[in-house]
Amino acid sequence: MNLYAESSGVLAWLLGDSGGESVRKALASAEIVLASYLTLIECNRILIRTGATGRLTEAQVATREARLRQVETHWTLLEMDAEIVERARRPFPLEPIRTLDAIHLATALVARSAVPGIALLSLDDRVRRCGRQLGFELLPA
C-alpha cells in the first residue's frame, strides 16, 4: 500500500486523538508515504500551539516533534510546485473546499500521477469526501 499523508491523519496519530491508532497502522504498513511540506508545517504549528495553550507539556511537544522528524525521513516530501498550485486554483468536485485542503488534494493528485493507486490518508471529512469523488481509496477505511 502506498499513501499520501494529509495533516489531519498525521496529527491524530501524533496527538493520540480518535483515529490515531488506525493512522499509525496505515503509516507503518505503507511501502511508500508521500506528503506535502505543508503537512509538516501544519503538524509542527499545531504541536507548537498545543504547547503554548497548555494542552501538552514542553516535553510532550518535543517528543512528538522528534517522532515526526523521525518518520518524515522515510517519506517522500513534495514541494508546492507550479503544477500543484495550478490544480489547487481550480474547482474540486465538492466545493467549498478550504485553501490548505485544496493544496493537499492537488498534491495528492500529483502524487497519484507518479505513484498510481496511491491511497489518501485523512481524517478530515471534507478532504475525504472530495478525495472519494476524485477516485482515491481512503485510509483509514
Where are these regions (language model features)?
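Acidic, PIN/NYN-like endoribonuclease modules and their adjacent C-terminal/linker elements
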Residues: N2, L105-A106, V110-A141
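Hydrophobic core segments within long, regular secondary-structure runs in both alpha-
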Residues: A62-R69, V85, R128
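Acidic catalytic patch
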Residues: L40, Q70-E95, A102-T107
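Alpha-helical elements of the RecA-like P-loop NTPase motor core of helicases
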Residues: A12, E21, E86, R128-R129
